[in-house]
Design a protein with these regions (language model features):
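N-terminal intrinsically disordered, cationic/polar leader segments
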Residues: 1-262
Length: 262
């Protein structure tokens, strides 16, 4: 059996690949949780900031000899990713990450390792008035500066088989403030404590699936939507008397495992 291609550490890539797609397949049929009214994504616009790395033993001459006959230009990587987002028939960033990773392997036979990190570029609905009534626009969207979902994936080629070696989903840069109900007591500097104070938190939350294929969204009832995770976290933050950040994180982790057994 060949050694793990990632262990060779011969890889390079490109970041800030901005890709946008309109009218992707909607995400529907996800499982309901009590803390969230989220039922799916229309995916009228799907945007992502993507970082890609590719590697393999075949790239060694480019590193040690400057011989570039097998090197894939980073601008070509960008075009490849943007084109395949247009071809993608699924509804999630995780599914696209798998799809484009496999496409790299199928197109370039000398690649042994692909890493894709795809961060959502979120857009929110705006309202418009037509026929005298106020409603959500299905043509105009506003870029959000709030939290964003992320898909991280590594795939390797071993003995002519493609293996998904790592996969995780995330919500990044979630910022919340609770104006009361947070008490930090029994610490060393007691005179500096306040039994009821506002608490502003920044959170990055990551999760993995028991079955990696559930991450792609092809079976929606087994897919964990980042929007549901946000709603779950805000509900826990509201209902928990926060005695420490550690306790809050513990409660969030436990409830995520209960609500999403997959």
């Amino acid at each position: 059996m060949k050694s793990n291609p990632k262990e060779n550490k011969l890889y390079y890539g490109k970041g800030d690949v901005f890709a946008y797609r309109t009218y992707a397949k909607p995400l529907t049929g996800i499982s309901h949780i009590p803390e969230s009214m989220f039922t799916g994504r229309h995916n009228i616009i799907l945007g992502a900031n993507i970082k890609v790395k590719i590697g393999g033993k075949a790239f060694e001459p480019s590193f040690v000899e400057g011989e570039n006959s097998l090197v894939i230009a980073t601008d070509s990587m960008k075009n490849f990713i943007q084109r395949h987002l247009a071809y993608y028939e699924g509804s999630t960033l995780e599914g696209f990450s798998e799809y484009v990773s496999k496409a790299f392997f199928e197109t370039y036979s000398h690649i042994d390792y692909v890493s894709i990190i795809a961060e959502e570029i979120p857009f929110t609905v705006v309202s418009e008035v037509s026929d005298g009534s106020l409603k959500a626009s299905d043509l105009v969207f506003k870029k959000s500066r709030n939290e964003r979902s992320r898909s991280s994936m590594e795939m390797i080629r071993m003995d002519d088989a493609l293996i998904l070696s790592e996969q995780s989903s995330s919500i990044m840069d979630l910022q919340l403030i609770k104006v009361s109900g947070s008490s930090f007591e029994d610490f060393v500097e007691k005179e500096l404590e306040d039994s009821n104070r506002p608490l502003y938190i920044y959170l990055n939350i990551h999760w993995i699936y028991k079955e990696q294929s559930d991450a792609f969204g092809e079976t929606p009832r087994k897919y964990v939507a980042a929007e549901q995770v946000v709603d779950l976290v805000t509900s826990i933050f509201h209902n928990t008397e926060t005695t420490s950040i550690q306790y809050l994180l513990y409660e969030i982790g436990c409830m995520m495992l209960r609500r999403f057994p997959q």
